[in-house]
Design a protein with these regions (language model features):
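Charged, amphipathic alpha-helical segments
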Residues: 1-5, 50-51, 105
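Short active-site oxyanion
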Residues: 40-44, 158
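Short, structured beta-strand-loop surface elements
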Residues: 52-125
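Ferredoxin-like iron-sulfur electron-transfer modules
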Residues: 144-164
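Flexible glycine-rich active-site/ligand-binding loops centered on an Asp-His dyad
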Residues: 118, 133-151
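A short, well-structured catalytic beta-strand-centered motif of the EAL phosphodiesterase domain
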Residues: 32-37
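A short, Trp-centered hydrophobic/proline-enriched beta-strand micro-motif
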Residues: 9-25, 63-67
Length: 164
């Protein structure tokens, strides 16, 4: 599976993911944020400038995100990404609203949208983990010039004995 396919699954199939950032005391904070776009240059999301999440992103522009889909454990696909983010202002805001029409209900006027700022996760690395197939499928990936760092163990499907 290509990195772009994985990012597309994260953005379109999972969409709402948990973001972890660090606060001003270096303590972890999490929140659920929708991924609005995915392309060859990374993942895009937005937040309002008055939120604590915005302040954390501006102060320490690194995130770790995780998302999953599936009805039960053996139908679950999980994707995690960690990397660097940057504000791109209102660039791509119109495209975000076009591709995510539910946003119009949340921010119905141009005036209400002035509070929003778009962020790009532009380089990072991550892992795709699929328990819907047995043995489980695991793949590391990277983008934006980052290198893949293998973590944990590696499952070699043809040598898997099914945890016996």
């Amino acid at each position: 599976m290509t990195t772009q396919e994985i990012l597309n699954i994260l953005q379109s199939d999972i969409h709402s993911v948990v973001f972890a950032t660090l606060d001003e005391h270096g303590l972890p904070q999490t929140c659920v944020i929708d991924l609005m776009l995915a392309d060859d240059d990374g993942l895009y999301f937005l937040t309002a400038k008055g939120k604590a999440f915005y302040r954390r992103l501006m102060a320490k522009p690194f995130v770790s995100i995780s998302g999953m889909k599936g009805g039960d454990t053996l139908s679950t696909t999980a994707i995690s990404v960690r990397g660097a983010v940057r504000s791109i202002g209102t660039k791509r805001l119109a495209e975000i609203f076009e591709k995510n029409p539910y946003m119009v209900k949340i921010y119905p006027t141009e005036k209400s949208r002035e509070a929003l700022e778009v962020f790009q996760l532009y380089k990072g690395q991550g892992e795709y983990f699929d328990l819907a197939q047995l043995p489980p499928y695991r793949q590391s990936f990277s983008f934006g010039g980052e290198r893949i760092q293998e973590n944990g163990y590696r499952i070699i499907p043809e040598k898997c004995i099914g945890c016996q």
